[in-house]
Amino acid sequence: GAADLVIAIGSRFADRQTGNLSKYTANRKFIHIDIDPAEIDKNVGSSLGLAGDMRTILKLLMRQTPKGDLAAWWVQIRAWQEEYDYDYHVGRLTVPWALHQVAQNTRGKAYAYATDVGQHQMWAALHLRVEEPRTWLTSGGLGTMGYGLPAAMGAQLAWGDSRRVIHIAGDGGIKMTGNEYYTIARLGLPVLSIIVNNCGLGMIRQLQKVLYDERYIACELDYEMDYVKYVESFGIKAVRVGAQDEFAAALKNALEDAAQPRVIVMDVWRSFVEPMAKGGARIDEFVDFK
């Protein structure tokens, strides 16, 4: 990386963030800010460790920092964005394409997002555009499958009519807490759920492919479940889609019907979240899935 100095705020420098630690820390200095003094220098030695409130510390740091000319750096960032821009034009229904449609149709409007855990969570982080605080609800690396629907329900109760919550989940997570559609229906919460149905635990399958040479176990959900009928049994409107035009129409209808809970079930073929780096590798040393 190009950074001479890394200012880390509330970070524990876990291996998923740093990759190979010796390569990550080479030839750069760290300022580590955390409310908990025990986190400072635990995984990465800092040149300056500051324990306290982020807002107060950043104000003090800004007073000591001269204003620099970042024009050339912004040019470089935009060049990288163009070089590595995701190609959504694949001609079939994929999760990245669908989430790009969600982003395009909700940008600048009053929406919040809640995800479950798995591949869809990674794709949501990559392809949605979250631009306001407290509008992105995800359990990060904790791996709490089933989190998404209760989180969306609670957020919708908190936001009320001022903001609508879009919930992204996989078929695995819905099997864990899908019963909460009863509460959503009973309270009339206008949560929009998008269920990614790839008949498996996609993230587990991807990890078993990369780390265990495709020795798959306990990640296939091949017994077909009708998620539309399941959701409809609670009195919630649901639709099943398998093509781009079907998803676009379903999304348009669901966004227009803003007062009611709606569910879109996406049938998609198994694919991989990219880019991905193996544990212990440098964070730009990506797995080749071809």
Which residues fall in each region the model found?
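Structural signal for hydrophobic packing residues in well-ordered secondary-structure cores
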Residues: D4, G10-F13, L58-P66, Q81-D85, ...
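Active-site beta-loop-alpha junctions enriched in small/polar residues
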Residues: R12, G118, W269
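Active-site glycine- and acidic-residue-rich loops that bind
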Residues: R12, G91-P96, G173-M176, Q244
